[in-house]
Amino acid sequence: VEAGYPWSLGKAAAGFPPAVPGCYTGALENHPDLVDWISKTRPLAGNAGDVLRRLRDPVELESAATDAGLAFPETLLSPRGVPEDGSFLLKPLAGAGGRGIRPWTQSLAADPTHGLLRAGRTHAWQRLTVGLPSSAAYCLSPGKPQLLGCARQLVGEAWCHADRFAWCGAVVSSPAVSGPAHERLAARLEPLGEVLAERFRAVGLVGIDLLVAADGLVTVVEANPRPTASMELYERSGAGSIAGRHLAACGFALPAVSPRVQPSPQPEASWAKAVLFAARPTPIAQPLIDALLEQAAIWTEVDGGWPSLADIPRPAQVIPSAAPVVTIFAAGRSEADALQRLRDRVTHVDAMLGNA
């Protein structure tokens, strides 16, 4: 076993009893060999390596999208003949969160490091497509594909200090407040869930990145064959335990849990989350942590007990520029209201960090 990430996770998994299922999230879909290695010693609560390889293959994903009646952007696996005017994106095949995506331009094509790209299949060239960044969340089990919902994805938002193509959050409306546009989009996306379950034998939670054009055209961009960072918002909106759904769909009986106080779902609310990135090297001191926790307690009470901040950094460190600092949540009466409340909170936290 190789040392370092991601193979160090295999060593960590080996420390658990063999009966404990292995479960993973992003971006281990890019390491199917590791997933297979872990599954040799324990049951797997998720998709095996062969499913990951197929769903991460743009050729196979294009076929699935087309058969489900959805569009897929022109995608090439070699730079030969690709226009160098920015109309195509250079995308790592083993990417996550939008990292490493760049417009394919003359200057980038002239970079001598791209000789390495031609020697191996590590990148794809995908036509830049216009549309609202969105995602579909599926819960798949044999014969029972289910669309949990659709989310608006936040990508490259300047108020999060995110790079142009970096994922930085999501907005979700529960079915109780979703309008006709959401219902039409859901109807368009249901056939894809059937293809994912039947053709690929995918199980558990699966996310699909989409672009939705103003005329309603839905373009599939990428598959994430594991629980995604947007899905916890569905739990806040009344979809039940996301982890529980995933385990059950993968064939595992849910363990009995002791009663505990937890926030009530808010089916009448829309929920939003954002990842705030560091605009510059950001020192983290204990007084800052204390102030964040104090503010979080206020917002958490406003949001019915649901945590308003997550991934709070440890003290005595410096967060590098462009690295994630903290995750922020907000609820609202509509998507627009939730998003505005989220932006207000991000601005407040940003000022606390000294990034404003």
Mark where each language-model region is.
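Conserved metal-phosphate-binding beta-hairpin within the catalytic cores
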Residues: 197-232, 276-280
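Conserved ATP-binding module of the ATP-grasp superfamily
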Residues: 63, 71-73, 89-90, 101-135, ...
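A conserved helix-loop-beta module that forms one wall/lid of the active-site cleft
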Residues: 39-108, 112
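ATP-dependent carboxylate/phosphate-activation module, predominantly the ATP-grasp catalytic core
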Residues: 127-130, 134, 138-195, 224-248, ...
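ATP-binding N-terminal substructure of ATP-dependent carboxylate-amine bond-forming enzymes
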Residues: 1-50, 67, 313-314, 320, ...
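Short amphipathic alpha-helix with an adjacent loop that forms part of the alpha/beta core around
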Residues: 7-19, 81-85, 113-117
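Conserved hydrophobic "DFG−1" position in protein kinase catalytic cores
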Residues: 103, 138-140, 210-212
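Peripheral (often C-terminal) accessory segments that flank ATP-dependent C-N-forming ligase machineries
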Residues: 247-356
